[in-house]
Regions:
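Aromatic-anchored transmembrane helix interface
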Residues: 35-41, 58-71, 78-100, 119-120, ...
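Alpha-helical transmembrane segments of multi-pass inner-membrane proteins
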Residues: 39-45, 90-93, 107-136, 147-211, ...
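Interfacial loop-to-transmembrane-helix boundary motif in multi-pass membrane proteins
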Residues: 3-12, 54-67, 89, 97-125, ...
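TM-adjacent membrane-interface loops and short helices in multi-pass inner/ER membrane proteins
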Residues: 256-288, 294, 301-308
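Transmembrane alpha-helices of multi-pass inner-membrane enzymes
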Residues: 42, 161-164, 332-341, 345-390, ...
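N-terminal signal-anchor transmembrane segment
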Residues: 1-50, 68-75, 129, 194, ...
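Flexible juxtamembrane loops connecting transmembrane helices in multi-pass membrane enzymes
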Residues: 225, 229-261, 281-284, 400-418
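Hydrophobic transmembrane alpha-helices and their immediate junctions
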Residues: 4, 303-334
Length: 435
């Protein structure tokens, strides 16, 4: 029934809106608006679905410990750390509620198909850009929300594996749609130079190839479509006679430099870390985040980040050894984990929600262990209430003015997104007040 999948539908609408570049005007920039829209989604998850959520004993202990350690440091946090903490709590609430919802509902294929088609539509405009590139040797933006090309690249990584899922389910007409969509998704990654997304997808396909025999022909066909896109990409550059874009770049995109810089700062305070949003706070010249989820947890959050990382590893291992989880779900999770190692997929709001949707889809297939029922669900409710109180406290005290500011925008620092579109921004301000 419709009422049993409301959160899934809301997230589907959120992603379609993000992909097609539509925004309602809550903020001047769509990126900032997508961040603001995460609040009602998280609040809905907290208020409506928490009564259905049960955490294992291990999860209860981990988040109780993280909560205690976080509480001892709250008075030392600045606005950037509160932004990062708020974002983490928001995503975990949505992930927990969505996992519970998907575990109890059946058919979600239609909603997934809508998201896939929405992601496919902007890719069609690559053809126009290719023609212009050949004729004028100038590349024109083809995305509907091209504030930064990397955002869209990470959004379609989990959507790529949803596409394979529907192909396996013999979803109507996807037999014809599948090769075209794969080709255009790959074309988007090649022209954007999205090495992280390409590595993530190919690794995910390798995992899918290993885990399932009956779909190995499908994997090889998919690789063929990707290779065809690569040939079109290289041919375009050849005919344009101007190699201005290439996925095979020799530069590092300053990833290694950022990692080394933050590592040197972290060595001075390894237990507490340098603080969430550290690069945004100091206006680091190469970017406002280090493009690596795992190093970010360790270097920025210290012991708290390490504990959370242990919990993540535990959940991933349990997911992969669970035979009830579909191979395509394991492949998609692998791709998300790889992409998070080199990109901002778990920083940008649209890619965050796309990844959370796929993770919830995968985790919802897991067979629940008996450890979930050893203790009363009252322990889980108390834990959620405490984290919910912290979530509301941060929202009111540190993000209240942003949520209540209609038509505002970020403006501080470079247009290198982090929590806000301009990553160095502490709070949104009315557009008329932007210098």
């Amino acid at each position: 029934m419709l009422k049993n999948k409301i959160l899934f539908l809301l997230i589907g609408i959120y992603l379609v809106e993000a992909i097609l570049g539509y925004h309602i005007g809550w903020s001047i920039y769509q990126y900032d608006e997508l961040r603001l829209l995460q609040f009602p989604l998280a609040l809905y998850a907290l208020l409506i679905f928490t009564k259905k959520i049960e955490y294992s004993i291990f999860t209860q202990i981990i988040f109780f410990l993280i909560g205690v350690l976080t509480a001892t440091q709250l008075t030392n946090y600045n606005i950037f750390q509160f932004q990062e903490l708020w974002s983490a709590i928001t995503l975990l609430f949505i992930l927990s509620a969505l996992t519970s919802e998907l575990r109890n509902v059946g058919n979600i294929e239609h909603g997934i198909a809508l998201i896939i088609v929405a992601a496919f539509i902007p890719c069609l405009f690559i053809l126009i850009s290719i023609i212009n590139f050949i004729l004028y040797k100038q590349w024109f933006d083809w995305q509907f929300n091209s504030g930064t090309i990397r955002i869209y690249d990470s959004v379609i990584v989990p959507i790529f594996f949803f596409l394979i899922f529907l192909k396996n389910r013999n979803y109507p007409y996807f037999h014809y749609f599948y090769p075209i969509a794969i080709f255009f998704f790959a074309l988007a990654w090649f022209f954007d130079g999205a090495r992280s997304a390409l590595l993530a997808v190919m690794t995910g396909l390798l995992v899918f190839f290993i885990y399932t025999r009956k779909n190995r022909n499908l994997v090889l066909q998919t690789c063929g479509y990707i290779f065809l896109a690569f040939l079109v990409y290289k041919s375009t550059i050849y005919f344009a006679d101007k190699n201005t874009m290439t996925a095979m770049r020799t530069g590092t995109s300053m990833r290694a430099e950022m990692w080394k810089f933050v590592f040197e700062q972290w060595k001075e305070k390894p237990w507490t870390g340098v603080g969430g949003g550290y690069l945004a706070e100091i206006q680091y010249k190469y970017g406002h985040h280090i493009h690596n989820l795992y190093l970010r947890l360790i270097f920025e959050w210290g012991i708290v980040g390490c504990i959370f990382l242990i919990w993540m590893i535990y959940q991933v291992v349990r997911l992969f050894i669970d035979k009830s989880v579909l191979p395509i779900a394991k492949a998609g999770v692998t791709a998300i984990l790889i992409d998070a190692m080199f990109s901002g997929s778990m920083v940008y709001p649209a890619s965050q929600m796309a990844c959370i949707l796929f993770l919830a889809f995968a985790v919802s297939q897991r067979q629940q262990s008996k450890e979930y029922f050893k203790y009363s669900c009252g322990v889980t409710k108390i834990l959620i209430s405490l984290w919910g109180a912290l979530f509301l406290y941060i929202t009111i005290m540190y993000l209240g003015q942003d949520l209540t500011c209609w038509g505002c925008a970020s403006y501080v620092g470079r247009m290198a997104p982090n929590f806000w579109f301009y990553g160095g921004t502490e709070h949104l301000i009315p557009a008329t007040q932007i210098p």
